[in-house]
A protein has these predicted regions:
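Noncatalytic, solvent-exposed loop/strand surfaces
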Residues: 1-218
Length: 218
């Protein structure tokens, strides 16, 4: 329910605790907060949808003090934030319930935004970044591949597929230009990252074909 804690790893003693809903106006999603915290230098990043701004909140690892906020969405999603080093420089990728954002680390205005309103706000899996491409995939509205350019503000939809590639909770896996994704209708699927071309599907040989199939791909 929006409580952030830090504990001593040797003794289990509580070092600090923050109520992010009460103190930072974080927005509780339908199924509660589940985005994993992301460590960054001396800070830890939380995707908690603070209002009116602060999709991502940075706290001091040492004492829990708020260091900065960045990003604007109407609530919090479930996807952990992703730190990347793009051609234009470092940026923070946040997939919220209504948009995908490239954000400045340390606060400020978004470098870029791509609208993507997700049914029930279920932006769940952490985006992946390879070959200058950000990839996200949702259950109802499919997959988006966003190509980043030479400058921090350069971002455009490279391709999208709302019918054939629809993931949910299973993290996509990338290897040598190919992505592997657990699709809701056809099971484990392999496709080209740059084009979205489907190479093969296993038709649920590894997972149940009923609603919400799930598996961890490694």
């Amino acid at each position: 329910r929006g409580h952030a804690f830090a504990f001593n790893s040797q003794t289990g003693e509580k070092i600090w605790m923050r109520n992010l809903v009460a103190e930072e106006n974080a927005t509780v999603p339908i199924w509660g907060f589940s985005s994993s915290p992301e460590p960054h230098a001396s800070e830890v990043l939380f995707h908690v949808g603070c209002q009116p701004t602060g999709s991502v909140l940075a706290l001091s690892q040492a004492n829990g003090e708020t260091k900065w906020k960045v990003g604007r969405d109407e609530g919090a999603g479930y996807a952990p934030p992703l730190l990347i080093e793009s051609k234009g420089g470092p940026q923070l990728i946040c997939w919220g319930p209504n948009r995908i954002m490239g954000l400045p680390i340390g606060g400020g205005q978004a470098y870029w935004e791509v609208p993507y309103e997700v049914k029930y706000g279920v932006s769940i899996t952490k985006p992946i970044y390879h070959e200058d491409i950000i990839l996200v995939s949702g259950y109802w509205h499919g997959t988006r591949a966003i190509l980043l350019g030479e400058k921090l503000g350069d971002a455009k939809i490279l391709w999208s597929d709302e019918i054939n590639l629809r993931g949910l909770m299973s993290q996509a896996l990338y290897r040598k230009g190919i992505c592997f994704l657990l699709d809701r209708s056809s099971g484990l699927s392999a496709f080209e990252l740059k084009s979205g071309k489907i190479l093969w599907r296993d038709q649920h040989q590894l997972t149940p074909s009923e609603r919400n199939p799930q598996a961890s791909i490694v």
